[in-house]
Structures are given as C-alpha cells and as structure tokens.
Amino acid sequence: MNKKVKIIGAGLAGCEAAYFLANNDIQVELYEVKTLIKNEVQKTNNFAELVCSNTFRSQSLLNAAGILKAEMRRLNSLVIKIADSCKIDGDDALAVDREDFSKKLTDVIKNHPNITIIEQNVSYIDDENDLTLIATGPLTTNELKEDIQRLIGKQKLFFMDASAPIITKDSIDFNKVYYSGRHKQGKYICCPLNEQEFNKFVDDLVNAEQVQLKEFEKSIFFKGCQPIEQLAKTSKKLLLKGPMSPNNLLDQNNQQPYAVVQLRQDDAKDSLYNMVGFQTNLKWPEQKRVFQTIPGLEKAKIVRYGVMHKNYYINSPKILNFKLQVIRKKNVFFAGQITGVEGYIESASSGIWAAINILAFINNKKIKPLPNTTILGALTNYITNSKIYSLKPMKCNLGILEQENKYQSNDKFYSYNNSKNSLENYIEQLNKILRTNI
C-alpha cells in the first residue's frame, strides 16, 4: 500500500497523528485552512491553537486527566511533550503559555522531513483512493461538513448546541430517589421535589452566574435550545410542563410529587447518568452548587458539566469502529473533537490512537482494541460503543474505566497502576506486531 496519509486539520489530534505517522516513516500531507479562512475563535496562524483554557488539567494520578496524560507520555505524545516544556505555575495543573505552546508545536510539525503542509480548504474526501484522517474539530468548514455528510449520511452528523451534566450513579442518595418512567420510556431515576424545594431550586437557578456567550454563539443557541435557567426565567410552568414534569412518575407510595428531575442511564456499564432536559449555560461551580440542592443529589459527582457552544461531531457509535475507522469506508479515519471526545487531551490522545490504527492498516496488520482499563481505551470504547443510543461529547473520567477490583483494593492509585500495567502489556504486543518502538 502507498505509504502516504492525508490528514485534514492541524489541531491537537491532527498534529499528534501526523507526528506519530511521520516518525514511523509514513509520508504525511497535513491540510490546514486557517490561513485562508478564519473562524470565530482563532487568534493566530499557528497549529493546535488553545482557544479556550490554557490548561491541560490536573497532573494528579488520582484522577482521569492525570492518568490520561501519563498514558500519552508513554505513547510519546508530542502535545504533552511541548506542554511540559511550556509549563507555567498552575497548582497541580499542566497550565501552559498558549502562544508559546502553539508556536513550538507548529515549528516541530513544519520542520519534520516526512510532513508536508498544504494550506487548502478541503471540500471533498476521495474515500476510494486516498487514505485520509479527518481531524477538523468542532468548527469544521461548511464545505467540508457537507462532504462529510455525503460520506457518512446526512442524518449522522450532529450539531450540538447544548448538553446536560452527567453524574456518577454511586454518588446518588438512593434513600431519596426512586425508579419510574412514563409509558414506554423505561425506568429512569427520579429525584422528587415538593413545592417548597422546587421554588427554592428555581430561585437558586435563575440567580446563578452564567457563562458569557460570544456574539456568534448567541445567534445560534437560543433559537432551538433553551437552557434550563432560561426556561426558569421565562416561567416556572415551563419547567413543570417540561423537564421537571411529574406526570405519571409515581413514587414508592403511589403518589405524584410536585416536581421531578429525571436521570437517564448514559453508558452501557450503568455507572453514569445524565440529567434529562438540563442543558445549561451556568458556570461549572454554579452547576455543582445549584444542582446539589436537588434531593438525592446532595453529594452528586459531576463527571461532565453542561456546556453550550457550537460543535459539530459525528454519531461515532454508528459510524466508527474501535480503530476510529469509518465502518463502510475503510480508507477514512476520524480523530479529535469531531468524534465526540471533549477536551484538549482527549482530542490529542484520539489522534495518537487513530495514527496507530492507520499504521496497522498500511502494513495490513490486525491489532486489538486498547484495554478498557486504560483511560484512552475506555474513552474510545465510550464513543464507538454501538449500544449508546445517542452520543454526547465526553471528557475523560474514572466512571468509564473497567476496574472490577477497585473497591477491594487499598491502593489509592489503583486506577493509575491498573492503567499503567495494562498499557505496558499492550505496547509490548503492539511493538511486536507493528515493529515500532513506542
């Protein structure tokens, strides 16, 4: 097979993939449009621009973000290598000088002998002749978005304008909640509120501090999707007839509460639940404060906060296999936020994983999925698991890990050590199959 790969998008995922493949003697054509077409959030012409926060989150090996970065270091991540070199003070977080970070990373990519930079607005994917990785992120150009729709089907490309918080099941107080569901809805976890609790919740909600939307976002979101706090400001009745309706949600005593917050299972393992209809634009500390006033959620652990922003992503469980390869178009792979992962390190790490699978594809080698005991493996499984009915973008969290013996272990670093050992064993086998030296 021709050892040349087209990568569309020089963001975190695209640069990681290009770097990995180029270091394995694959010729890479890296396409980037930002010098030709500016989107609403870009500030410079450098690659992998950090347009939101300047932090890659915690370095602690007690949490998922720290463990994922450890996995990325072991996989020779360019993003983490550059981030380490640009670190600024930020407690235990890996915070960087964002301009220095993007400039250094761009220099590495542009000076790699196996990478050719092509400044072009790609509008057509030749899925028959070109081996292509699409890593265009949430702000994919309209022209390419239309061709992606041709490639995967018009109903398979989602526009996400809002999402609701996701919490862990084991943090719910089951002494205060019950299971119920309307008609053929299935069994949801129901958090009942009496009239006094409901009124206090609404007061807290409407007075909570919100994230300030950019001008280009304001025109997009409030047309088709009302955040929960906007509904509350409009009318309490909208909540009682909408996301907090108690109709046909009888409790254990066969009584109908004044209001109900429903929680819906969000993963195949039954460990994560999302707050139904609670799309929100509240600041994250405010989400925690306000939503923990709901009975049963006083100690709720939020693993993904509600967000509102422009974001294109594909319905990966229906389109991609575990290799991040289009099931019906074997020459096409996806990586980054367009796959449904959310966050800098999640996007970058998916680029590494896609590149590993592209290398295997080029060499006609079969490799197994990453173990679900690793953060990257569990996250990849989450976004490509065909059992998920409707994919919502996900940051890494410990709730998606496979860790059967965690609660029998006294090791507070159990998740990290389990991930480390699993990844080492996997890499040992991978190096033998692909004749690499990771």
From Swiss-Prot:
Coiled coil: none annotated. It is found in: Cytoplasm. Keywords: Cytoplasm, FAD, Flavoprotein, Methyltransferase, NAD, NADP, Transferase, tRNA processing. Its main location: cytoplasm. GO terms for cellular component: cytosol. InterPro entries: FAD/NAD-bd_sf, MnmG-rel, MnmG_N, TrmFO. FAD binds at residues 9-14. One of its GO terms (biological process) is tRNA methylation. It comes from the Bacteria. Its EC number is 2.1.1.74. Its cofactor is FAD. Pfam families: GIDA. One of its GO terms (molecular function) is flavin adenine dinucleotide binding. It catalyses: uridine(54) in tRNA + (6R)-5,10-methylene-5,6,7,8-tetrahydrofolate + NADH + H(+) = 5-methyluridine(54) in tRNA + (6S)-5,6,7,8-tetrahydrofolate + NAD(+); uridine(54) in tRNA + (6R)-5,10-methylene-5,6,7,8-tetrahydrofolate + NADPH + H(+) = 5-methyluridine(54) in tRNA + (6S)-5,6,7,8-tetrahydrofolate + NADP(+). Belongs to the MnmG family. TrmFO subfamily. Catalyzes the folate-dependent formation of 5-methyl-uridine at position 54 (M-5-U54) in all tRNAs. This is Methylenetetrahydrofolate--tRNA-(uracil-5-)-methyltransferase TrmFO 1. The gene is trmFO1.
